[in-house]
């Protein structure tokens, strides 16, 4: 995937691999593609209509996380990144790529990454890179979702934090049955 990097991969229930990537000199939202053959060939490259690639209004993307939840027969994915409109252009044109990076947020997809109808703010202060992991079945972490992110109260680079939550928290009262029904 020329021009992309710092990607996240998720295997879907049908065996396809979903690719979700930052674009270093971005023209917009997150870059996506899929592979039907285990990653040898990537097909259907497009920009997500829903997922930002870092702070909007800049030309530089940001590392984000993506993970598939281990729920049999369903392709529920989570994505993490910044959800901010406060961007400035890079220093070469008088701005800063990090000065207004904020609002670490998680989005949820119920259709294998085609749409992302749910989002939930995790950290409303300065933030930057993030990644996601899920707990394993049969362990104390079962059902938990972990978000590791850069961010603190004053600056994106003053701390690395871990937020732990579950899918119910992400949904914030929305009915999962309704969301799964819309996905099919």
Each predicted region: which residue ranges?
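Asp-box/BNR beta-propeller blade signature and adjacent active/binding-site loops
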Residues: 1-184
């Amino acid at each position: 995937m020329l021009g992309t990097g710092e990607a996240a991969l998720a295997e879907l229930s049908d065996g396809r691999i979903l690719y979700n990537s930052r674009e270093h000199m971005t023209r917009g939202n997150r870059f996506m593609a899929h592979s039907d053959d285990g990653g040898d060939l990537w097909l259907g490259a497009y920009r997500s209509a829903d997922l930002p690639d870092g702070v909007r209004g800049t030309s530089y993307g940001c590392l984000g996380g993506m993970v598939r939840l281990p729920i049999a027969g369903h392709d529920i994915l989570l994505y993490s990144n910044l959800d901010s409109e406060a961007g400035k252009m890079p220093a070469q044109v008088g701005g800063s790529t990090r000065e207004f990076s904020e609002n670490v947020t998680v989005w949820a997809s119920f259709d294998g990454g085609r749409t992302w109808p749910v989002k939930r703010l995790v950290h409303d202060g300065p933030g930057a890179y993030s990644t996601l992991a899920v707990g394993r079945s049969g362990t104390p972490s079962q059902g938990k979702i972990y978000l590791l992110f850069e961010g603190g109260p004053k600056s994106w680079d003053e701390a690395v934090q871990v937020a732990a939550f579950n899918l119910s928290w992400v949904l914030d009262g929305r009915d999962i049955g309704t969301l799964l029904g819309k996905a099919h």
